[in-house]
Amino acid sequence: QNASRTHIMKKLIVDLDGTITKGDTSDYRKVSPNLDVIDKLRFYKSLGYEVIIQTARNMRTYEGNVGKINIHTLPIITEWLDQNEVPYDEIHVGKPWCGFEGFYVDDRAVRPSEFTQMTPEEIEELIAGERR
């Protein structure tokens, strides 16, 4: 057996704003939770997945300075996640922001609506279809 496959990674890399939270980001301390996504994260956590949150929050505000984001933004993020009982194993700040008219392209990506409505098997089939 291939040594790299001995420990199969089961990780979800999840965006924060507009995915785990609802869209209104005028006050990050009071932003509404997306309960459907949070419930699904708990489900995947129970299946043994690691939950890694990756966010572009405040990348414009601090002009990409991750050190300032770690000081000023990360404590607000962890407090909000804990208050809303969001499972997470890691938080990665400094995700490049695509702008208002750009978007992210990834061959293993699913949209929040697909994540909440599809089974793990359906999601895997969706991703496998991208590789064909």
Features from the language model and the residues they span:
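Catalytic phosphate/metal-binding cores of nucleic-acid and nucleotide-processing enzymes, i.e., regions
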Residues: 3-132
